[in-house]
Amino acid sequence: MHEHLKEKLAISPDQPGCYLMKDKQGTVIYVGKAKVLKNRVRSYFTGSHDGKTLRLVGEIVDFEYIVTSSNLEALILELNLIKKYDPKYNIQLKDDKTYPFIKITAEKQPRLLITRNVKKDKGKYFGPYPNAQSAHETKKLLDRMYPLRKCTNMPDKVCLYYHMGQCLAPCVKEVTEEQNKEIVDEIIKFLNGGHKEVRSELEIKMYEASEKLEFERAKELRDQIAHIDAIMEKQKMIMSDLVDRDVFGYAVDKGWMCVQVFFVRKGKLIERDVSMFPIYDEPEEGFLTFIGQFYENSSHFKPKEIVVPGSIDSELVERFLEVEATQPKRGKKKDLVELANKNAKIALEEKFYLIERDEERTIKAVDHLGKQLGIETPYRIEAFDNSNIQGTNPVSAMIAFIDGKPAKKEYRKYKIKTVQGPDDYESMREVVRRRYTRALKENSPLPDLIIIDGGKGHLAAASDILENELGLYIPMAGLVKDDKHKTSHLIIGDPPEPVMLERNSQEFYLLQRIQDEVHRFAITFHRQLHGKSVIQSALDDIPGIGDKRKKVLLKHFGSLKKMKEASIEEFVEAGMPKNVAETIYTYLTDKKTL
């Protein structure tokens, strides 16, 4: 531990507050809160930790803290600091998980819609629904029963919905505010749990129509009742009080936390939310951070009641969220909390099982690949691929797989320097020479297997450099593609012999991943360089544009297309003098063929 950290720890206060961990660049990498700052911060630098926490601690070179008057104030401050600094070790719940709602618009002639965006627009929103199908089924039923307008824009004549009895045709007929209000009130009653009452009313109307020998009408009403029964059958009642509540449960294992939320609406369990993330604090602190971020998500309405596990300070949750929070000791609510806890525990167990299974498969694939090639297990594999289009900007890329997984910090990109024109073999010789000359000089780890994306010529070129120039004898294989440019087989040895792998084997899938990854990495690098050169060559003939201004324009606009669409003012904003901006604008707008 750095000496100045020890000094800071010694004077840290015994009070609640937030702490900000910083790396050597002074960047905030983690924000936490504590009831007692001194104890919490010290805990990071004492005792044993799991791998994730050790990585965090390994990056900490400084910290600061903010004292608060209460744990509640610390919780609020923590959320604001996380939003401000976006530290890489903090969880940041994304707003990408949204649920569908049924909306009654506030238009003069209201409509029923399904939306995932809840706005403050005077519309009435009902939900969330567990999925789009459930929302669409409910809306379809309401459309059949209640004749609000269906068209987005008012047509000039009545549509099919009018003839089906599902619209009052406000496009050509007068529909009063009172008529619409009556329909809207019925829909609201239905969506607020009054479907049984609506069903009873429809049943009475069905019998009345039957007695009047209005059999078509009776059949329509019977079908509506059947639709209600079918939809409500999918939404079984689990609570009789019809209160909207969110029930939380969580589990912690191997430095990870899983939180499960059950959404109970009008007595029905309609959906659950599952979140998994690494945790560096005590579980209770991690849960409080999660729940604060959870309700900042615009798709998560605060219900009337929040139910939390017994280990959580429900009074703090209640004051923080300004919603009734309960900690049940018995009964149905406690059963639901325990069910959420159980689901969270199972989800974590499944996560670790899948990780272990995938690791086992990957290690076996690496081992089997070595046996197929007649070499020792290739724990470290390095693969090379060249990329050029019509001989321009030739590049090469190297990727590394360690224990069958991509090690992206080991990836390398190369601009071809000594080869003129499109010569794949000489390009491969140059890159292999540069890569392993440097590896020897820096005493870097050498691979157990080198894979060259290419045939016999590529393999011969790379082997010549490796063995005859550098004196290295590392197993090397060529990765041959079929006529569809897909992975076909390997070649190895001198002379090269084909090694055919089972196409459904794990080692074949491993080779496919390696080939796809090295090709992706090479082509991405090539496109970056090609894009830059196109811009620079297009600017070569413009007076007043040298290398420095080319770089500025490239950085600001990113592409020639954006430059051609830019105004004079935008070139000035990019740092060009007014007269130069006018010259660039005139030149690019005149050169239509660029």
UniProtKB/Swiss-Prot annotation:
What is one process in the GO biological process aspect for this record? DNA damage response
Look up keyword Coiled coil and say if it applies.
no
Q: In the record, what terms sit under GO molecular function?
A: DNA binding; excinuclease ABC activity
Q: Identify the residues that the record assigns to the GIY-YIG domain, covering every copy.
A: 14-91
Ranges where the UVR domain occurs: 196-231
Enumerate the UniProt keywords alphabetically.
Cytoplasm, DNA damage, DNA excision, DNA repair, Excision nuclease, SOS response
Question: Does the keyword field hold Cytoplasm?
Answer: yes
**Pfam families under this entry?**
GIY-YIG, UVR, UvrC_RNaseH, UvrC_RNaseH_dom
| Superkingdom, natural source | Bacteria
| Disulfide bond residue pairs | none
Q: Where in the cell is it found?
A: Cytoplasm
A single GO cellular-component term on record: excinuclease repair complex
What's the stated role of this polypeptide? The UvrABC repair system catalyzes the recognition and processing of DNA lesions. UvrC both incises the 5' and 3' sides of the lesion. The N-terminal half is responsible for the 3' incision and the C-terminal half is responsible for the 5' incision.
Q: Which NCBIfam families match?
A: PRK00558.1-5, uvrC
What does the similarity note say? Belongs to the UvrC family.
Instruction: Give the quaternary structure.
Output: Interacts with UvrB in an incision complex.
> What HAMAP family does UniProt report for this protein, alphabetically?
UvrC
Question: What PANTHER family does the record point to?
Answer: UVRABC SYSTEM PROTEIN C (PTHR30562:SF1), UVRC/OXIDOREDUCTASE (PTHR30562)
Report what the protein is called: UvrABC system protein C
